[in-house]
């Protein structure tokens, strides 16, 4: 029983560490500057940083179609 508990704790730790590494590579701190861009997913983002951050965190390939709202 102790072995199973130890394995469970190790597994949870590994999953948490992997999630933390994913979050660290994504830039999530963006300015509040409003320079809207239209994303390839049809969404208007407040600025390019927000688009890039959203794409990274959600592991999606979103690009800027054009400056301004969609």
Swiss-Prot record:
It is found in: Secreted. Pfam families: Kazal_1 (PF00050). GO terms for molecular function: ion channel regulator activity; serine-type endopeptidase inhibitor activity; toxin activity. InterPro entries: Kazal_dom, Kazal_dom_sf, Prot_inh_Kazal-m, Prot_Inhib_GrowthFact_Antg. Disulfide bonds join 26-56, 30-49, 38-70. The cysteine framework is IX (C-C-C-C-C-C). This is Turripeptide Ici9.2. It comes from Iotyrris cingulifera (Sea snail).
